[in-house]
């Protein structure tokens, strides 16, 4: 199972995520709040996701095969989030992701959000710009 642990995440991302969460809560205390759904992901998990829309039923969810995703390294150069609201209900409103992306971009310009990806937009995804420079 993919990790949700901040200890598996690049320190730049940990700092940016924590600061962005605090600011988001301060600005939007009554809105659904972000939480981490994935930091590190194994190559097997990556290949399973890559199969969607190709050899497995469903829509494509990634363009990255194993080793091509910033999630596939430790520390991870990416994280995914979701939002949880009242009653522990998941909230996938694109507006929440946009608000969080704008906050994190101001806090740490090295972090980019997949909401603006051209080939396969991925609003829950945040990664280090030029992430390959940060992985081994």
Task: Give the positions of each predicted feature.
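Active-site acidic/histidine clusters and adjacent loop/turn architecture
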Residues: 1-38
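Structured segments of extracytoplasmic/periplasmic soluble domains
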Residues: 19-27, 46-53, 103-110
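Cytochrome P450 catalytic domain signature, combining two hallmark sequence patches
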Residues: 53-68
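Generic secondary-structure microfeatures
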Residues: 38-40, 53, 83-85
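Acidic helix-start/capping segments at beta-turn-to-alpha-helix junctions
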Residues: 36-49
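Catalytic cores and adjacent binding grooves of peptidoglycan-active enzymes
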Residues: 64-136
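Residue-level detector of short coil/turn "hinge" positions at structural boundaries
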Residues: 33-34, 56, 111-113
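Short, surface-exposed, charged loop/turn segments at secondary-structure junctions
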Residues: 50-55, 130-132
């Amino acid at each position: 199972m993919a990790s949700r642990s901040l200890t598996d995440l690049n320190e730049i991302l940990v700092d940016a995520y924590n600061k962005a969460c605090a600011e988001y809560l301060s600005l939007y205390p009554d809105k659904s709040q972000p939480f981490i759904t994935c930091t590190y992901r194994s190559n097997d998990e990556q290949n399973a996701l890559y199969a969607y829309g190709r050899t497995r039923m469903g829509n494509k969810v990634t363009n990255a095969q194993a080793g091509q995703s910033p999630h596939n390294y430790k520390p991870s150069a990416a994280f995914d989030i979701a939002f949880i609201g009242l009653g522990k209900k998941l909230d996938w409103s694109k507006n929440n992701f946009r608000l969080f992306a704008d906050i994190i971009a101001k806090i740490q310009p090295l972090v980019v959000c997949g909401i603006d990806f051209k080939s396969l937009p991925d609003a829950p995804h945040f990664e280090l710009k030029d992430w390959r420079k940060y992985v081994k």
